[in-house]
Structure formats: structure tokens, C-alpha cells
Amino acid sequence: MSTTTSLIIAILAGILGIVIGFFFRKSLAEKKIRSAEDYAVKIIEDANKDAETKKKELLVEAKDEIFKMKSDLDRENKSRLKEISRQEDRLNSKEENLERKNASLEKKHKKLDSELKKADDMQLKIQSLIDEKELELEKVAGLTSDEAKNIVLERVKTETIREQAAIIKEIESKTKEESEKFAREIISTSIQRYAADQVAESTVSVVNLPNDDMKGRIIGREGRNIRAFETLTGVDLIIDDTPEAVVLSAFDPVRREIARIALEKLIVDGRIHPTRIEEMVEKARKDVDNTIREKGEEACDETNVHGLHPELIKILGKLHYRTSYGQNVLKHSIEVSNIAGMLASELGVNVKLAKRGGLLHDLGKAIDHEIEGPHVELGVNAAKRFKEPKDVINCIEAHHGDVEPTCIESILVQSADAISAARPGARRESMENYIQRLENLEQIANSFDGIESSYAIQAGREIRIMVKPDVIDESSMVILAKDVAHKIESELEYPGQIKVNVIRENRVSDYAK
């Protein structure tokens, strides 16, 4: 009984334990579920908070982006408005220029009409004079109609020539009295020419080799070295039968100089292959850039011109490698600067401005092979870009007479340029062409009636004409000089100007017995 009871109690205790355990585990499970639900709710709340924060951040970023786009659009609109305003200003300026040109043309037309009217009046006067003389000659006995006509024509011709000579003298006298610039220009052309070296113009450079075996190394396997060299430098490398020498050919002297330096470095180094060629060409390019800058600075020091923009100095230095008719353009610019400075000093005008304008007058020749356009226009654009004074810009654009000079210094630069180019030996000219030009000059002078002899002197800068005093009178000398000058202008090509000097000499001799 005791055992059975114990067993029953044990079973009941086990069942009770199971029931208690079940309810305990159920309670734990419910707690975990509630905890999980709370955690889930918290996650959802945190997620909502993060989403709200992200939303606000995105809104702020969107507003910033919209503000930035609006600012960019405003700037772009302002820039376009400025450009439109500039274009309107340019159009207005062009319109004003056209109006000024129209006014000038109208003035010239009026002047031409006035001159035509004067010519018509002169013609009427001549015709009236002819009629009067014919009436007089009809009364003269013993003269045929042809003889009377010849007498009248000869008298009219003589009177007309005298009237023309008087008019020309009056105009020249009036011009000399009223124009101070014209007087200064005449004075400036009388100053002695400045001497400088002549430089031969060439499109090739010769590089000496230590031996002919070096030619094969320069060519390289299947010509790869020479192809790489020509591609990197833009220069033709000519290898022929000339012993221990090769030739570099190019119209651009800067590229040719870079190629010469690079090739000489390669020959000294001995290692010639495409990679080494590229290194040496780059070094040579830097060397030439340094030389260009040094030459520009030396030119400024030599002419005492300071305050130029570094880029202008570099462009100026490039002129060291440019030649024109055998004349080094940088030396020519220095020469023009010095001559213009001397003229300005003699005339009491701005020496610094004249020297600065003279030094920069051919600036465009340094870049005319890189940018299309005449060298005068390129030089003016460069000077404007680097903020050169207005008078210096006028010196550049007026030195070939393309525009009117606005200051006396521009006229001096123009004169100095002509003097530098025209002085004997400045620019290379073959002896045959030089002699032919002088012969043509004398032939033109001798083609007129009444010429006793003529001589081309001052290297063709002056023609001296001796006339027969019994054929050419003093009033006819003025007409003769003008006619010779006009014929020279129409038939000859020459730099600068040619002076026509007509000389009439009377000699009287007698003998004492």
C-alpha cells in the first residue's frame, strides 16, 4: 500500500511538474513575444525617425541644388547680357565709323567736284585764250593757218606750264607752313643712317658628325630613328654623300634650331633610339625657350625699354630666329628702336615712347607662322592683349601706313623702319638685281626730253638729273621732277623712297684779249 501510494504520488507530482513547467514555459514564451513586439515597435519608430531625418536632409540638399542652379543661371544670364551689350557697343562703334567714312567720302566728293569745276574753268580759259590768239593771228599777214596754229599752241603750252608750276609751288609752300608733322618728317629723313650687321637668310642648318658611321646610327634600324626625329621636331633630316655632315631643313627657324641642338646632344651622348631622341628634343626645346627669353631681355636692355609683359618679351625673343630679306628681325627691331629714339631726341618728343614703339613694331612677325593674318594685325592684337599704351599700338599699326599716325612718335617709327630697311647693306639683294634697278632708274630719267645726263646715287635712293638750260626753264623743272617721280612710282618696285633732284645750270664764258 505504501508503495502504491508512493507511486501515485510520484505520478501526480510528475504530472503537476509537467503542468507547472508548461505554464512556466508558456509565460516565458509570452514574455519573449511581448519583448519581440516591443523591439519591433521600437525598430519601426527608429526607422520612421531615420526616414524623417533623411527626408529633411534630402529636402535641404534639393533646396541647395535648386539655389545653386538658380545662381548659375543668373550668372549665365548676366554674362549673356554683358556679351549682348558688348556686341551692341561694337555695332554702334561700327555704325559710327561708317558714318564718319560716309562723311569723309562726301567731303572728298565735294572736293573732287570743286577740282573738276576748276579744271573746267581752266579749260574754258584756255579755249578763250586760243580763240583770242587765233583772231590776232588772222590779222597777221604772211602766215599760213598751220603756222598760226603752231604759234598759238606753243604760247598756250608755255603759259599753262608756268601756271601749273606756280600752283604746285604755292601748294607745297602752304603745306610746309601749315603742317608741323610734315616739317618734322622732312627733318627726320635727313638724319644719318644707323649701321648694323647683315645676317644671311637660310632655311637649312648643317650638323657636323665625328665620322660617317654616325649616319647609320642616326637612321636606325629600318629608319626608325630618323622617322622619330623628324616626327618630334617637324624638320627634314637630309643624309646624303656629304662627308661627316647632315643637313636639317625647315622654314621655321625655331624648329630648326631645336632640331640642331637635339641632334648635337644625341651625337655627343652616343645613345640614339626613339626614347632618347624624345628626351633630347624636349631638353633642346627648353634650351631654346630659355634662349628666346634671354634674347628678348637683352633686346630690352640694349634699347633701355623696360616694363614689358613677360610674354611680350618671349615673343620679342622669337624674332632672333626670324629673318626678312637677309636681315635679322630682332636686330632690325633694335635698330629701328635706336633710330626712332635718336630722331625723337633731336626733335624734342617722347624718346621712351618712340623706342618702345620701334622695338615692338614687327612683333607680329614672331607669330605670323602660327596664326593667320598680316604681321601688323597680329602685333597690334598681341600689344592690346598685354595692355600696351594706345600710342605704342598706333606705332605698330601705322608703321606700314595701314592707318593714319595719331602721334609724332608713330611717324618717327615709320621713318626709322624705312631707314633701317633701305640703308645700303641692310637687306640682301643680288648684285644683278641691284645694278638692273639702278639702270632702270637712269633710263626712266633719260626718257624725258631736255635731259643732258642722269645719275643714280646713294645706292639708288636718289636720282640726280642734269637738264639742258636752253630746253628746260625754271618753271618746267618742277613739272619734270613730278613727272619723273610719278613714272618711277608706276614702273619700279623699291623700298622706302627715292629723291628726284633736278639741276639746271647756266655757264657763261668769255676771253680777255
Curated annotation (Swiss-Prot):
Alphabetical list of PROSITE patterns matching this protein: HD, KH_TYPE_1
An annotated GO cellular component: plasma membrane
Origin superkingdom: Bacteria
Subcellular location: Cell membrane
EC number: 3.1.-.-
Region (Disordered): 78-106
Membrane topology: Single-pass membrane protein
Family the UniProt entry places it in: Belongs to the RNase Y family.
Entry function: Endoribonuclease that initiates mRNA decay.
The name this protein goes by in its record: Ribonuclease Y
Species whose genome carries this gene: Finegoldia magna (strain ATCC 29328 / DSM 20472 / WAL 2508) (Peptostreptococcus magnus)
